[in-house]
Regions:
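Charge-dense, helix-prone N-terminal extensions
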Residues: 1-128
Length: 128
């Protein structure tokens, strides 16, 4: 059984390392990594946007209730008009890929946990 609701999506997105949330543009709950959005869920309107690969984008927009996301569709973001437009297990995989794609381009120091030393700092400590 799939939990297909904003709370389940929120829990899933915030489980990723360094993921944060911020309410933006009225009722959009944005999930971010390093200050960059990897998924957006509507609180008042059950919709979801996320980034995907060009191949997945082409396949998804052929489905009912899925289309290029407004303003960012040209960057291969899709919008699901209904949270149940895809199966829960498929949605989890799509969000995971979005997170990984955005995290790969996000500045590392923005999502490094406080208190964790950089590689350079650890090397200096070993030599001292």
């Amino acid at each position: 059984m799939s939990p297909m609701n904003v709370d389940a999506i929120r829990d899933f997105c915030l489980a990723f390392p360094g993921a944060t949330e911020k309410l933006q543009w009225g009722d959009d709950l944005c999930f971010k990594i390093g200050g960059k959005i990897f998924a957006m869920a509507g609180l008042d309107n059950p919709r979801l946007c996320f980034k995907c690969t060009p191949e997945t984008f082409a396949e998804l927009i052929e489905r009912e209730d899925i289309h290029p996301a407004p303003y960012v569709g040209r960057y291969k973001w899709v919008m699901l008009d209904r949270l149940d437009a895809v199966r829960w297990d498929e949605l989890q995989e799509l969000i995971r890929v979005s997170y990984e794609m955005v995290a790969a381009k996000a500045p590392r120091k923005k999502f490094r946990k406080k208190g964790s030393a950089s590689k350079r700092t650890r090397l200096k400590r070993k030599r001292a």
